[in-house]
Amino acid sequence: MKADIHPKYAEVNVTCSCGHVFTTRSTLGKPELHVEVCAACHPFYTGKQKIVDTAGRVERFRQKYGNVQRLG
């Protein structure tokens, strides 16, 4: 490897909005990183899936385009 061409690879403390803190290594250049979602609070990893209610959007679509018939 060539000398002095690679970025600095240092430890970074990652803080999630849920309060979970962990340390990793990165070329970020800052000692702290704040994220909104991590493995401790993401629904995929916790098994607590959230169902998004889109009934209002579907009803608006049906009201707007419900009377349209296919041509042909």
From Swiss-Prot:
<feature type="binding site">
    <location>
        <position position="41"/>
    </location>
    <ligand>
        <name>Zn(2+)</name>
    </ligand>
</feature>
<dbReference type="GO" id="GO:1990904">
    <property type="term" value="C:ribonucleoprotein complex"/>
</dbReference>
<dbReference type="Pfam" id="PF01197">
    <property type="entry name" value="Ribosomal_L31"/>
</dbReference>
<comment type="function">
    <text>Binds the 23S rRNA.</text>
</comment>
<dbReference type="InterPro" id="IPR027491">
    <property type="entry name" value="Ribosomal_bL31_A"/>
</dbReference>
<comment type="similarity">
    <text>Belongs to the bacterial ribosomal protein bL31 family. Type A subfamily.</text>
</comment>
<keyword id="KW-0689">Ribosomal protein</keyword>
<dbReference type="InterPro" id="IPR034704">
    <property type="entry name" value="Ribosomal_bL28/bL31-like_sf"/>
</dbReference>
<dbReference type="GO" id="GO:0003735">
    <property type="term" value="F:structural constituent of ribosome"/>
</dbReference>
<dbReference type="GO" id="GO:0019843">
    <property type="term" value="F:rRNA binding"/>
</dbReference>
<feature type="binding site">
    <location>
        <position position="18"/>
    </location>
    <ligand>
        <name>Zn(2+)</name>
    </ligand>
</feature>
<keyword id="KW-0694">RNA-binding</keyword>
<keyword id="KW-0699">rRNA-binding</keyword>
<dbReference type="GO" id="GO:0005840">
    <property type="term" value="C:ribosome"/>
</dbReference>
<feature type="binding site">
    <location>
        <position position="16"/>
    </location>
    <ligand>
        <name>Zn(2+)</name>
    </ligand>
</feature>
<keyword id="KW-0862">Zinc</keyword>
<dbReference type="GO" id="GO:0046872">
    <property type="term" value="F:metal ion binding"/>
</dbReference>
<comment type="subunit">
    <text>Part of the 50S ribosomal subunit.</text>
</comment>
<dbReference type="InterPro" id="IPR002150">
    <property type="entry name" value="Ribosomal_bL31"/>
</dbReference>
<keyword id="KW-0687">Ribonucleoprotein</keyword>
<dbReference type="GO" id="GO:0006412">
    <property type="term" value="P:translation"/>
</dbReference>
<dbReference type="InterPro" id="IPR042105">
    <property type="entry name" value="Ribosomal_bL31_sf"/>
</dbReference>
<feature type="binding site">
    <location>
        <position position="38"/>
    </location>
    <ligand>
        <name>Zn(2+)</name>
    </ligand>
</feature>
<keyword id="KW-0479">Metal-binding</keyword>
<protein>
    <recommendedName>
        <fullName>Large ribosomal subunit protein bL31</fullName>
    </recommendedName>
</protein>
